[in-house]
């Protein structure tokens, strides 16, 4: 058994019930994903909360920001967390592209399909311009 291993084991053994054993190095996530920052303003009269994996392009229509820049992206925050936008507040948020197949369905049904860039998989035809037009028709605010 190495000295490092026994030190770790002794830390765990000497930790009181309910105590915490922290890693020696910080935990990171989404390190290699490109980040897009957008300024968001809540034009509504109520707070709006957006979860970590909600397609940001399709968030509440009272949030005003560059929706085209948010197409295919989500908040760069840890899973199961959210950001709250108070009425009248303006804040800048970091967005990252969805991982995996980048096929998004539901939310506010503005996209319902592939949101990636480059070669189109499975004969899907992303239509970003149609989604932007549909968002405008349905009253989703955009700063551009």
Swiss-Prot record:
EC number(s) recorded for this UniProt protein: 3.5.1.5
GO terms for biological process, alphabetical: urea catabolic process
Catalytic reaction annotation: urea + 2 H2O + H(+) = hydrogencarbonate + 2 NH4(+)
Pathway participation: Nitrogen metabolism; urea degradation; CO(2) and NH(3) from urea (urease route): step 1/1
UniProt superkingdom: Bacteria
Subunit structure and binding partners: Heterotrimer of UreA (gamma), UreB (beta) and UreC (alpha) subunits. Three heterotrimers associate to form the active enzyme.
Name of the protein in its database record: Urease subunit beta
The encoding gene: ureB
């Amino acid at each position: 058994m190495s000295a490092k291993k026994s030190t770790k084991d002794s830390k765990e053994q000497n930790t009181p019930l309910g105590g915490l054993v922290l890693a020696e190095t910080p935990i990171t996530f989404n390190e290699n994903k490109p980040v897009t920052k957008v300024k968001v303003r809540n034009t509504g009269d109520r707070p709006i909360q957006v979860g970590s994996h909600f397609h940001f392009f399709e968030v509440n229509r009272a949030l005003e920001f560059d929706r085209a820049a948010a197409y295919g992206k989500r908040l760069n925050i840890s899973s199961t967390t959210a950001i709250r936008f108070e009425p009248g507040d303006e804040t800048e948020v970091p967005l990252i592209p969805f991982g995996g197949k980048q096929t998004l369905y539901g939310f506010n049904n503005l996209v319902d399909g592939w949101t990636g860039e480059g070669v189109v998989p499975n004969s899907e035809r992303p239509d970003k311009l149609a989604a932007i037009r549909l968002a405008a028709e349905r009253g989703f605010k955009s700063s551009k």
